[in-house]
């Protein structure tokens, strides 16, 4: 498994990268990535029913559709995203515990009472800090999730507010939960970069075939 700590913060590039790795390679991957301020919507969502269009337009926040289902999520540099791409393991499809276990175990080792909820979310004391989604094809599974570490909650709540004048929609709508940042629950304060390093170490230590990998110009 190749472990990538992706440094590019372009949301369109990062989403295209994980889709490319999933659809056009035959390797296993774990990737950490962060995006500049953006909204990422599920493949089946009516975008207008999920975002505060006026706020998003005025603040020039890009809205990008991903290849997995689930709700709309707000990204900024205080939000850390993780992606697993696993080949030939269709039995792990919908097994969110399997893919989120490293995050939960790492946080618990740091004294944070993280747990998986029944709705594919990770919670701390009943508050959501991570949403997860998956897709699969004949070759394997892509699982990705968000980790609110030190995100701008003000922008998050404004960007995802629904306009009360909108028409009723039959499209899938997000189930909103109370949210929290991981950083608020750490006994010892660390940066998002330090947390990223800890999570990468956790992945490498837990997988015998895992090795760090940096994307080359040829890859890009």
Locate each region found by the language model.
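Short, hydrophobic/aliphatic alpha-helical segments
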Residues: 51-65, 127, 132
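A glycine-rich, hydrophobic loop/mini-helix early in the fold
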Residues: 58-82
């Amino acid at each position: 498994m190749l472990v990538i700590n992706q440094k590019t913060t372009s949301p369109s590039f990062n989403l295209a990268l994980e889709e490319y790795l999933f659809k056009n390679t035959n390797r296993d991957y774990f990737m950490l990535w962060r995006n500049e301020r953006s909204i990422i919507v599920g493949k089946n969502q009516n975008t207008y029913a999920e975002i505060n269009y006026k706020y998003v337009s005025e603040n020039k926040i890009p809205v990008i559709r991903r290849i997995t289902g689930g709700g709309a999520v707000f990204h900024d540099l205080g939000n850390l995203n993780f992606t697993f791409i696993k080949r030939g393991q269709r039995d792990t499809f919908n097994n969110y515990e399997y893919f989120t276990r490293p995050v939960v175990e790492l946080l618990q080792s740091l004294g944070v009472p993280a747990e998986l909820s029944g709705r594919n979310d990770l919670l701390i004391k009943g508050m959501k800090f991570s949403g997860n989604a998956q897709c699969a094809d004949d070759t394997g599974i892509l699982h990705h999730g968000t980790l609110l570490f030190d995100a701008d909650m003000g922008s998050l709540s404004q960007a995802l507010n629904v306009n009360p004048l909108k028409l009723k929609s039959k499209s899938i709508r997000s189930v909103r939960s109370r949210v929290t940042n991981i950083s608020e629950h750490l006994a010892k304060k660390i940066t998002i970069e330090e947390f990223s390093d800890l999570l990468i170490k956790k992945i490498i230590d837990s997988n015998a075939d895992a090795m760090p990998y940096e994307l080359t110009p040829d890859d890009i």
